[in-house]
């Protein structure tokens, strides 16, 4: 059965190479590059064709014009395959291309194919589920890494000045996210101790060394910039990054132990992972607490200022009902005279002086015209 699969895979590769021999060179196709890609991503699971892989890398380094033929050939190769061997070799080839870090890679952004839901179509799922999971995890990392690398190259050429603290924090967070995705790439099934898987794990371990080293270097530079004058938001993010770096250091130690037991050659010598000194963590916490204390003190000062303000309230108008009023002579004469004249026909002989201020039982009628006190 295995011999039949190998023979079938070799026949497919030869057929593809035969077809490429009749194709013409265009802006999207390069027969020589296509041939190197087919050899580097063959159906042979016993070895990796490093010679043709390095030919592809030389094509990419030689001219940016070779990027389009590479993308076209790789996407065409991967989209048509149902073999985990071809898919994994294609991912390893892409990984090597990204490590070239040439300027033209900024045009790729995301990978030109999708293996997030890959499933091998040549064997039963019970035998290939581990390979499928491995390829999906590897693709997820490379897809994000390609986007991150493209963004970094673009920023470097757009503005060469130094990044701000916020930009450095953002970059470290992305690197930590990439490292987390790398740690998910591991063989989980018992039948995965294959030459091709070990080669892929070697590539993963090398990438872990590179990314973790960049994280440690960036954190060392960042700790110098986080001082009492820095903002609270920056200090909070920095503390989160430092704690995550400590946690990832522990995860890396376990991951390398697993790789060593599995037989990954690059993991035989487990490195000493850098630990963040406790003094640096406390220094960041002091910055955060110092900013919080300043904010609390500022609020307390504002409250004290509000308490020290004396509010001057205007007296409100009040209505007073009383029978003790000052009566001026003019008002008194006017009242007495008019009331007497008005009440002559009613035959009331009363002295108006004892009348109450507000008449309730008997209204007073005035026959003369009242003066207009509103019109000016």
From Swiss-Prot:
Subcellular location, record wording: Membrane, Clathrin-coated pit; Golgi apparatus; Cytoplasmic vesicle, Clathrin-coated vesicle
InterPro entries listed in its UniProt record: ANTH_dom, ANTH_dom_sf, ANTH_N_plant, AP180-like, ENTH, ENTH_VHS
Pfam families: ANTH
Keyword Membrane: yes
CDD domains attached to this UniProt entry: ANTH_N_AP180_plant
GO terms under biological process: clathrin coat assembly; clathrin-dependent endocytosis
UniProt KW keywords: Coated pit, Cytoplasmic vesicle, Endocytosis, Golgi apparatus, Membrane
Domain named ENTH: residues: 25-156
Gene Ontology cellular component terms for the protein in this record: clathrin-coated pit; clathrin-coated vesicle; Golgi apparatus
UniProt xrefs under PROSITE patterns: ENTH
GO molecular function terms attached to this record: 1-phosphatidylinositol binding; clathrin binding
PANTHER family noted in UniProt: CLATHRIN ASSEMBLY PROTEIN, OS08G0467300 PROTEIN
The protein, known as: Putative clathrin assembly protein At1g25240
Organism of provenance: Arabidopsis thaliana (Mouse-ear cress)
Lineage: Eukaryota, Viridiplantae, Streptophyta, Embryophyta, Tracheophyta
